[in-house]
């Protein structure tokens, strides 16, 4: 796997020996009906360890230092739905909704942000008989934030063809990952004196 990153977006990274421990508390509720599953969870984190950016305006060089972030609250709702469309076609839908809230000092200012986002994954399995199978999967993630950085929508599709050999003792699989190169992580950081964009392209295409 490889990734392409704009070099200027990497900046300089520094450690911090004065970091305090980070503490998280989690509560999760699950409800299951037959093969369907619904999950609700809440996570509260104090002192989350993050990388705080700063910029030299003369050179536009960015530096990142590890610091403790005040408070983060994270809510999630997850739904998993398996279906049997036909005798040879099964489908699974996984949908997740999230709400995250940040509250802390960040880059010298009081930083408060609450936002919603979601993701979904669709998995299809086809059984053609005589040991032949095909899987067609895809996912999508809506725009979201990480601290002051905003990530755009991204997604991907995967295709796999399988053939069972020697009375199911082994399997030959051919896989094509992200053929349309939709899985690109595009983000912008516009906060304080920083205005930058970044693009990361994981190269998952293989066969």
Predicted regions and their residues:
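Structural signature of Gram-negative outer-membrane beta-barrels, strongest in the C-terminal barrel
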Residues: 1-46, 130-133, 142, 150, ...
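Outer-membrane beta-barrel translocator domains and adjoining extracellular loop/strand segments
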Residues: 1-5, 9-13, 48-57, 102-111, ...
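Transmembrane beta-strands of outer-membrane beta-barrel pores
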Residues: 3-4, 33-35, 42-48, 97-103, ...
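Outer membrane beta-barrel strand-and-loop segments of large Gram-negative receptors
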Residues: 14, 20, 26, 37-94, ...
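Residues on the lipid-exposed face of transmembrane beta-strands in outer-membrane beta-barrel proteins
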Residues: 19, 27-33, 77-83, 120-126, ...
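Repeated loop/turn-to-beta-strand initiation elements of outer-membrane beta-barrel proteins
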Residues: 35-40, 87-93, 130-136, 167-172, ...
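C-terminal beta-barrel architecture of Gram-negative outer-membrane proteins
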Residues: 97-102, 117-165, 177, 188-191
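C-terminal beta-signal and adjacent terminal beta-strands/loops
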Residues: 165-207
